[in-house]
Amino acid sequence: DMGNAYGIDIGTSNFKMCCSDKDKILNEKNIIAIANKTELLAFGDEAYEMYEKAPEHIEVSFPVKFGVIADIENMQTLLFNFFNKINEGKKITGSDFYIAVPTDVTEVEKRAFYELVVDSKVKAKNVYVVDKPVADAIGAGLDVTKSKGIMIVNIGAETTEISVLSLGGIVISKAVKIGGNKLDDCIISNVR
């Protein structure tokens, strides 16, 4: 089967994937359930149902922490399983992958996103790394090529990235380790 293009956004809490020839977007919890240390039990939303409820022999974990990949092996398993899910089990190889990565992370952390896809079982033809703020702006229908500055604020589960774009590039981008989870906690503690 001829390869398509896939866009991926790997977040701390959610994994999003879209495909150039389908108009659906896969958006599931970025979480995995492993039984007896080796056996894949569930992934995505199904694994999230088990989070904090599983017996001891089942490990349910999020492989991304603070916006960067903390557990490569489990993240590769998730990537492959989400890829199969969006393709409804059809064998597809030789596709192009565009992966949105945070800007305010180290080169090593950025490279980990690239290598994750390159080394995985999705058998990519090409892997392109796209700065998340630029992807966000384009996705929001903004013209990033203009000289007028655009400010993008991306609030994730554990990080918030604030960026200013101009002339197709990033002028400045800063990430802080506060996101939706922290906001939820603050609301909960104030409501009690």
Positions of predicted regions on the chain:
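Short glycine-rich anion-binding loops that position phosphate/pyrophosphate groups of nucleotides
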Residues: 158
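Nucleotide/phosphate-binding catalytic cleft detector across ATP-hydrolyzing
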Residues: 1-155, 165-192
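A structural feature that tracks compact, well-ordered secondary-structure segments
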Residues: 161-163
